[in-house]
């Protein structure tokens, strides 16, 4: 609802300083600031003001400011402190109830594309107000302030609140969606096992924070690599949230596979359906051409080149990220953000009849014979309620079973590497090979 009418009876915010930009820091046990809160006003600064006014249906008034307890939790950034209270509005049909979306790695390139898609309404719809809770690090906090400033300047009507912090317990408070993008990239000389441990510790901490303060039905999408095992670590540290609610992002791999099949068949990519990425987000991933369809027909009836499908197609999908890095000089960011949007929309929009989508999900109870207690990409369908079910009507041949066994073995080995982070004892790391995607190097 746009602000269309001003009412002079609403009181003005109390002003405490003349500075244009200020920071409020809070600490727990560390000396460095853990939470930044800055306020912009057209002429003066409002340090501790919370804005609210009573809004009747079909009536909008200018907000009245109320002094906020300085000891209370700062819950807004900049101009978002000056927005009117949505509580009364939520009772009307103009807005849905505000949802809290937490994003880690919020100062990174992927988030730089994603946040503006979220704020614009592209993801959750044009009538869904959102609050963005952005998690950064001590090193990235200034960049995160810049991101918040850009969000301010974009004037998104659906973006009602922005919080920036380096404390996951603050960012994940009441989160209904958690998009976990931040992870340490693999540097020169870093062994794959070491990276599993380094990033695993990050996701163990974030899992504990989600467990403590997030919504009990929060949906969690893990993007930071190695995302399958990071998702497993996260869910093991968040027993209060259903394991089924955790996803490892394999949608970019699915999109890449659809693109390659469309190119080979000479059709537009919307003709490709029923595409599954099985297994790990690594070069052992299995793009499934056996069950995929092109214009409603089995792929093998359209592309009658089994050698190309088994060799060139599969390798192109597995190594697409590395080729992009060679051409572009950096890893995927824009296309990754698009795939995150696709992954979310697949959960909140009913899956088209007969189709499905790929997501890395917890394997317990799966109908395919995949080992339990790992996060494995499989075909899913959704009714659009944020939940999903696994697809039963898929077929397997010897080639597909052989490939599935390889990626399954890799994930089981990764699981043993992080046993100390999942509460399953001492880690024993014996990885079958270095199959990490080039973008993670």
From Swiss-Prot:
> What is the transit peptide's residue range?
1-58
Instruction: Give its E.C. classification number.
Output: 1.1.1.82
- Per the entry, what modulates this protein's activity? Chloroplast NADP-MDH is activated upon illumination. In order to be enzymatically active, disulfide bridges on the protein must be reduced by thioredoxin which receives electrons from ferredoxin and the electron transport system of photosynthesis.
Query: Which InterPro entries does this UniProt record tie to the protein?
Result: Lactate/malate_DH_C, Lactate/malate_DH_N, Lactate_DH/Glyco_Ohase_4_C, Malate_DH_AS, Malate_DH_NADP-dep_pln, Malate_DH_type2, NAD(P)-bd_dom_sf
Q: Which cysteines are joined by disulfide bonds?
A: 76-81, 417-429
Q: Which GO terms describe its biological process?
A: malate metabolic process
**Does this entry carry the keyword Transit peptide?**
yes
Q: Which Pfam families match?
A: Ldh_1_C (PF02866), Ldh_1_N (PF00056)
Q: Where does substrate bind?
A: 186, 192, 225, 256
* Catalytic activity of the protein: (S)-malate + NADP(+) = oxaloacetate + NADPH + H(+)
Q: Which residues form the active site?
A: 281 (proton acceptor)
Gene Ontology MF terms: L-malate dehydrogenase (NADP+) activity
Tell me the residue numbers annotated for binding NADP(+).
105-111, 199, 223-225
One of the record's GO cellular component terms: chloroplast
Top EC class of this enzyme? oxidoreductase
Enumerate the residues marked as the site Activation of NADP-MDH: 76, 81
For this UniProt record, the keywords arranged alphabetically read as follows: Chloroplast, Disulfide bond, NADP, Oxidoreductase, Plastid, Transit peptide
Q: What is its main location?
A: plastid
Compartments where located: Plastid, Chloroplast
Q: Describe its function.
A: The chloroplastic, NADP-dependent form is essential for the photosynthesis C4 cycle, which allows plants to circumvent the problem of photorespiration. In C4 plants, NADP-MDH activity acts to convert oxaloacetate to malate in chloroplasts of mesophyll cells for transport to the bundle sheath cells.
Give the protein family. Belongs to the LDH/MDH superfamily. MDH type 2 family.
Tell me what this protein is called: Malate dehydrogenase [NADP], chloroplastic
Organism field = Pisum sativum (Garden pea)
Organism lineage = Eukaryota, Viridiplantae, Streptophyta, Embryophyta, Tracheophyta
């Amino acid at each position: 609802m746009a602000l269309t009418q001003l009412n002079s009876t609403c009181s003005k915010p109390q002003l405490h300083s003349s500075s244009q930009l200020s920071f409020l820091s809070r600490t727990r046990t560390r000396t460095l600031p853990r939470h930044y809160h800055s306020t912009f006003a057209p002429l003066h600064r409002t340090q501790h003001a919370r804005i609210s006014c009573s809004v009747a249906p079909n009536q909008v008034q200018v907000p009245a400011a109320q002094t906020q307890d300085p000891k209370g939790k700062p819950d807004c950034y900049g101009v978002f402190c000056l927005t009117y209270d949505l509580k009364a509005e939520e009772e009307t049909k103009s807005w849905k109830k505000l949802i809290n979306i937490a994003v880690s790695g919020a100062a990174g390139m992927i988030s730089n594309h994603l946040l503006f898609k979220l704020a614009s309404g592209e993801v959750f719809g044009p009538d869904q107000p959102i609050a963005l809770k952005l998690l950064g690090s001590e090193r990235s906090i200034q960049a995160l302030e810049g991101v918040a400033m850009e969000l301010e300047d974009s004037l998104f009507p659906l973006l009602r609140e922005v919080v920036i912090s380096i404390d996951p317990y603050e960012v994940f408070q009441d989160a209904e969606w958690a998009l976990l993008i931040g992870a340490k990239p693999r540097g020169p000389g870093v062994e794959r096992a070491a990276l599993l441990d380094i990033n695993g510790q990050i996701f163990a901490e974030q899992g504990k924070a989600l467990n403590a303060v997030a919504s009990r039905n929060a949906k969690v999408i893990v993007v930071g690599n190695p995302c399958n095992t990071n998702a497993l670590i996260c869910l093991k540290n968040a027993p209060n949230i259903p394991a089924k609610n955790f996803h490892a992002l394999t949608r970019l791999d699915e999109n890449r596979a659809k693109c390659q099949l469309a190119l080979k068949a000479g059709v537009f990519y919307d003709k490709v359906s029923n595409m599954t990425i099985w297994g790990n987000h690594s070069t052992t991933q299995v793009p499934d051409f056996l069950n995929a369809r092109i214009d409603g027909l089995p792929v093998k009836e359209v592309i009658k080149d089994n050698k190309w499908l088994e060799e060139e197609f599969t390798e192109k999908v597995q190594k697409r990220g590395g080729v992009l890095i060679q051409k572009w000089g950096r890893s995927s960011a824009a296309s990754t953000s698009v795939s995150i949007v696709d992954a979310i929309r697949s959960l909140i929009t009913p899956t088209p009849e007969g189709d499905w989508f790929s997501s890395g999900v917890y394997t317990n109870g799966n109908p395919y014979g995949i080992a339990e207690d790992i996060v494995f990409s499989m075909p899913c369908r959704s009714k659009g309620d944020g939940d999903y079910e696994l697809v039963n009507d898929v077929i397997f041949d010897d080639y597909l079973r052989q490939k599935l066994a390889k990626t399954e073995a890799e994930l089981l080995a990764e699981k043993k590497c992080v046993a100390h982070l999942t509460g399953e004892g001492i880690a024993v790391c014996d990885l079958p090979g270095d199959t990490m995607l080039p973008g993670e190097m």
